[in-house]
Design a protein with these regions (language model features):
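Substrate-binding/catalytic cleft of secreted carbohydrate-active enzymes
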Residues: 1-153, 157
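Carbohydrate-binding surfaces of carbohydrate-active enzymes
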Residues: 97-270
Length: 270
């Protein structure tokens, strides 16, 4: 297969899952390092191959399986479901680390859809699939459901789970590098640092709005080249402590890219 690909298309790089198994047989059949389930800092060792800080062996690395939502921590999911929110924080750490790593190509969440199947008790025979499953759950956890579990960002009916939004936030190509609570001076502009994480799109090719006290206004974006940082300016308003400021970014086709909600000063406690 390697020989055919290289003879047919010399421009196409080749990836091979579990590349250490090929190296073990002295087969040089990959240009891209495929690794699975590194930690949030990009470190993992598999079959004699390893990455550190999302890099390894002097070639580009693609983590073609990573970061499925929490589905194996059965007891924790029952007692502390907020682990699902924390999963989004870890995904954000991973993508931000990989984005800045030389040769870091990307990471693919495995998988998109929950894998749970609710099966009735059989009229004849035994429920062999429960014992057969490699990821057998505690009986009080799974009931008559089998499968790897709720490891998707949409459920079995393709409804978006909270993890869907966490994924959009983590992979967002527009990142405001400011704290959730903004310092301000009433009647003066707000200056926000922004990171353009698009690969090809200049920031002035998209558009943005800001909403303050229920009034939404357009926001002019200055040129910021891909993979660079710049500033956006929120025009002066009569800012007040505890009020919220919402900033939204849209594609040229008016599709939502990301939303940020900030508190001016100290949040009001009701």
């Amino acid at each position: 297969c390697w020989d055919w690909i290289k003879a047919t298309d010399t421009t196409r790089p080749v990836i091979f899952s579990y590349p250490g198994s090929a190296v073990e047989k002295k087969a040089e059949i990959f240009d891209i390092l495929s690794m699975h389930y590194q930690n949030v800092y990009g470190n993992v060792g598999q079959w004699g191959m390893a990455t550190r800080n999302f890099q390894g062996h002097g070639i580009p690395a693609l983590f073609d399986e990573w970061a499925h939502p929490a589905c194996y921590t059965y007891a924790t999911l029952q007692t502390d479901p907020n682990i699902r929110e924390f999963w989004g924080k870890s995904l954000d750490m991973m993508w931000s680390g990989l984005f800045n790593a030389p040769g870091g190509l990307g990471g693919a969440i495995w998988g998109y859809v929950d894998e749970t199947f609710s099966l009735p008790e059989p009229k004849f025979g035994t429920s062999f699939w429960k014992e057969f499953a490699r990821t057998a759950k505690p009986l009080d956890y799974q009931g008559n459901c089998v499968g790897y579990g709720e490891w998707g960002i949409v459920d079995v009916w393709r409804r978006q789970k909270p993890e869907f939004w966490s994924t959009k936030k983590a992979y967002s190509p527009v990142r405001l590098l400011v704290e959730d609570n903004l310092s301000f001076t009433t009647g003066q502009e707000l200056m926000l640092t922004i990171h353009n994480r698009f690969d090809h799109t200049n920031l002035n090719e998209i558009h943005a709005t800001y909403t303050y006290r229920g009034v939404t206004k357009s926001l002019e974006l200055q040129p910021v080249a891909p993979h660079t940082k710049g500033m956006i300016v929120i025009p002066a308003e009569q800012w007040e402590n505890g009020e919220t400021l919402q900033v939204e970014f849209f594609t040229a086709a008016n599709e939502l890219i990301d939303v940020y909600r900030f508190v001016l000063g100290t949040e009001k406690i009701i």
